[in-house]
Amino acid sequence: MKRRQAELFGALGENYGALPEGFVFQPDFISSDEERALLEEIARLPLEAAKYKQYTARRRIAYFGFGYDFTANRLGAAPPAPAFLGPLRDKVAAWMSLAPAALEQALVTEYRPGTPLGWHRDAPDFGRVAGVSLGGWARMRLRRYPRGKDTPIVLELAPRSAYQMQGAARWQWQHSMLPTRMLRYSITFRTRERS
């Protein structure tokens, strides 16, 4: 337990204990063997440049279950998730106390060195969100939305760590990624938000 607390304190630095309500962070969510197997499979995926309206990002992505059309601001069709994502989806769903089928979208993202991700909240068509980090480290920032005067929280996402967002963390906070220093991948799972 003390090792886990030390890892979390190191991940948050001076912001220890400052995570928003509904944000859960877990170091070493998967093993190095699981990470290696996932990276081998991801290397075979046909990743494409991420597009946001008329902007082409430096990230490369592959959507499964549902895509998202940022020009039309709506969900789009995407192929079913490949079999290799099944065990990870099951593990994430159990951690979130959900049935695996509730995680209807999977997104694989490649961050090459120097790739950022700007401030945003995930599209409102989605509900709960979980992400698993692979490869390199990342620095995730969190800030209230609408933006207040608080200093953003910075969280170090180590390889093999995971986070989940629901409630206030999902709807009342934005997140971003600082430019990566080394090649990194993330696998994001999302539930659908049904009104």
Language-model features, listed with the residues they occupy:
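Non-heme Fe(II) oxygenase metal-center motifs and adjacent flexible, charged/small-residue loops
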Residues: 1-195
